[in-house]
Amino acid sequence: MGSVRTNRYSIVSSEEDGMKLATMAVANGFGNGKSKVHTRQQCRSRFVKKDGHCNVQFINVGEKGQRYLADIFTTCVDIRWRWMLVIFCLAFVLSWLFFGCVFWLIALLHGDLDASKESKACVSEVNSFTAAFLFSIETQTTIGYGFRCVTDECPIAVFMVVFQSIVGCIIDAFIIGAVMAKMAKPKKRNETLVFSHNAVIAMRDGKLCLMWRVGNLRKSHLVEAHVRAQLLKSRITSEGEYIPLDQIDINVGFDSGIDRIFLVSPITIVHEIDEDSPLYDLSKQDIDNADFEIVVILEGMVEATAMTTQCRSSYLANEILWGHRYEPVLFEEKHYYKVDYSRFHKTYEVPNTPLCSARDLAEKKYILSNANSFCYENEVALTSKEEDDSENGVPESTSTDTPPDIDLHNQASVPLEPRPLRRESEI
């Protein structure tokens, strides 16, 4: 049995295979760009889906039913509404049936079911099981028709009335609490929190940066909003142990505090690819051939309920666009700011983006182009300003001096004149 278990979980089937894996494994587990270790299928199964649900199934869980029943309140809050209603209906009906049987037994033992008996009954007008069941419903729901009532003939009957009233209050409190907790769950708040379809890698302040965009579709704020990210990939340790999902934190400004965001308009989250980044040694070619997943998480408190919500998404390696930037979505109008969500997922290619890794860029192995080249965001802002000026009757010749033959998706060496531009909200 021990040998079978060893073969089942061992990644190395023989000493020769172990030597091959040891020679192919490198730091960070990505490979050297020329050859890549494939210990699993080429196409990675997404660990976190785009909608935030985790693609995980639990099997062979011992005593699962007992564990779920031990935490029955959380179980009722997590299950679907239809099952929740079924459980609550059963709770009421079973409690009515149980106490109806108790009152029927009391009447039976006391002889109240005998119509010829003239002595005082424990519960008046309870001479059948149906009558006992109706009395149980009237007692627990406090309907009080006044036709059936308990007498002082049997102390046990009085005790059962008191006990059923307490049980009914407990059931009502449990149901109301579970329903309110389920209705107040901030899970649906995630429907109005969105991530961009693709992440991008581009230059930002002279450094390669991984970026993705988040947005809030509601006007209500997300209090204490902050972001974090993790890179998931498989790797083999120096001892030959295979780790299917090694989790590596991606720094998005936790130390400096810029991971906390004011999410009123869409914001671009920036991860600077430095020597501490797991992407430091990866070039564009390595990214194209890599097999990893970046899980991004947005957390905050719902303003209406003060309950914490968490919105998740993920990006596979083939969903990271190298040398792209996001189109601007925030524009300054005369008395307000306008957010155009039709541009939220759109990107454009930035020419002259280094194709090398951040390490090669830091070691001056790649010569950067002119940093003052014309940017597409500026062209979009100027174009939008021209449209506003033309609507306000401003002559076209005074709006901008930008040459008309500039391509919106290409950079040109045209200096910008100082003028108030529309700005995108980014960190």
Swiss-Prot record:
GO process annotations (BP): cardiac muscle cell action potential involved in contraction; magnesium ion transport; potassium ion import across plasma membrane; potassium ion transport; protein homotetramerization; regulation of heart rate by cardiac conduction; regulation of membrane repolarization; regulation of monoatomic ion transmembrane transport
Listed name of the protein: Inward rectifier potassium channel 2
In-chain residues carrying the UniProt-annotated modification S-nitrosocysteine: C76
Topology Cytoplasmic: residue spans: 1-81, 179-427
Post-translational modification comment from the UniProt entry: S-nitrosylation increases the open probability and inward rectifying currents.
Signal peptide span: none
Annotated Gene3D superfamilies: 1.10.287.70, G protein-activated inward rectifier potassium channel 1
Family membership: Belongs to the inward rectifier-type potassium channel (TC 1.A.2.1) family. KCNJ2 subfamily.
Intramembrane segments: 129-140, 141-147
Residue ranges that the Swiss-Prot or TrEMBL entry lists as coiled coil: none
Stretch list, region Disordered: 384-427
Motif (PDZ-binding): 425-427
Assembly and oligomerization: Homotetramer. Homomultimeric and heteromultimeric association with KCNJ4/Kir2.3. Can form heteromeric channels with Kir2.6/KCNJ18. Associates, via its PDZ-recognition domain, with a complex containing LIN7A, LIN7B, LIN7C, DLG1, CASK and APBA1.
Membrane topology: Multi-pass membrane protein
